[in-house]
Amino acid sequence: MNVLILGSGQLARMMSLASAPLNIDVIAYDVNSQQIVHPLTQQPIDLSLEQAIKQVDVITAEFEHIPHHILDICSVSGKFQPTPDAIKAGGDRRLEKKLLDNAHVANAKYHNINTKQDFLNAIDTVGIPMVLKSALGGYDGKGQWRLKDVSQVDSIWEEMDELIKSSPNQAIVAEQFIPFNREVSLIGARNKNGQMVTYPLTENVHVDGVLALSTALEGTSNLQQQADEMFTAIADELNYIGVLAIEFFDVDGTLLVNEIAPRVHNSGHWTQQGTDICQFEMHIRAVCNLPLTGNQLLRSTAMINILGEDSLPDEILTMPNCHIHWYGKEKRAGRKMGHINVCADSPEMLQKELSKLANILDKQAFKALS
């Protein structure tokens, strides 16, 4: 079987690595260069997008910001999974909010903003404090503002207005500020037959708006049930096929959906060592309509993002429960260069392993371990 992935970054890379044992060949479409490339080497392949579409059995995506005309070309083939509507909802907060409402899942109050009057109306609808997010293109904390007081309206509007005017169809979504206890996420999958599986919830720690540490949760049956039910509602609403990630706010034991990602997700990288079938293989299984299994937690596991670093002390390689995954990317400040998965026999032992790691790694570069 042959699969074409739209996007050629680290997620496509890891999906390709997970596909090989299944005897599934993967090629990728680099959205920037508009070339078909090998997902591991990035070497161009002498195929046009149209030729690649004809050659493969399945088309999928590694991220949601795919140009709509590319989605449309792939959709016409009947091979694209999940649906273009799912990808578009993941890339546009307005569509995402509408989806959550249609699926009847709990999320923060919101108001769409295109003009300053909309902004003022949002204050009445949503209230202060509020979080303001770009409808298109925002990620890792970018394109966001927090309104704490009416005195900030003019200065924040000036920045938002500039963003709205910077690209067609851009807007702002105002959301009620949610004072949450922690952020958690759920990775799940659904295939064409409607079979669904979910992984254990993950607790996430962000530093400067970027995911830094994810830990698989154990013994959270009530939260897990809430998350599973919301996953089912959203996946069914979309008639979803593939891996779907949902980020939640945990508010005193009640979950509210923050956002969705219609793809494999950074907070699910721990599944490479923590489960039998990682999220990357699970996505390939789902889009190829293969059985979904192996989602149970095998051992206590956490993932640490490597941000802006292209080397680590060799001492880490002496730790048998540590697994480094590099992405083969050029070093850049704050860039996701790779991740480390850490495993242990219990949550207590995992914390000891993370403490060992904290003593080895640079404390400024890995603040979440401090």
UniProtKB/Swiss-Prot annotation:
Pfam families: ATP-grasp (PF02222), PurK_C (PF17769), RS_preATP-grasp-like (PF22660)
Record pathway: Purine metabolism; IMP biosynthesis via de novo pathway; 5-amino-1-(5-phospho-D-ribosyl)imidazole-4-carboxylate from 5-amino-1-(5-phospho-D-ribosyl)imidazole (N5-CAIR route): step 1/2
Reaction catalysed by this enzyme: 5-amino-1-(5-phospho-beta-D-ribosyl)imidazole + hydrogencarbonate + ATP = 5-carboxyamino-1-(5-phospho-D-ribosyl)imidazole + ADP + phosphate + 2 H(+)
GO BP terms in the entry: 'de novo' IMP biosynthetic process
Transmembrane segments: none
Enzyme class (EC, first level): ligase
Keyword vocabulary terms for this entry: ATP-binding, Ligase, Nucleotide-binding, Purine biosynthesis
Gene3D superfamilies found in the cross-reference section: 3.40.50.20, ATP-grasp fold, A domain (3.30.1490.20), ATP-grasp fold, B domain (3.30.470.20)
Residue positions binding ATP: 93, 133, 138-144, 175-178, 183, 206, 258-259
Function recorded in the entry: Catalyzes the ATP-dependent conversion of 5-aminoimidazole ribonucleotide (AIR) and HCO(3)(-) to N5-carboxyaminoimidazole ribonucleotide (N5-CAIR).
PANTHER family: PHOSPHORIBOSYLAMINOIMIDAZOLE CARBOXYLASE, PURINE BIOSYNTHESIS PROTEIN 6/7, PUR6/7
Quaternary structure and interacting proteins, as annotated: Homodimer.
Family: Belongs to the PurK/PurT family.
NCBIfam families cross-referenced by the UniProt entry: PRK06019.1-5, purK
Protein name, entry field: N5-carboxyaminoimidazole ribonucleotide synthase
Designated gene of the protein: purK
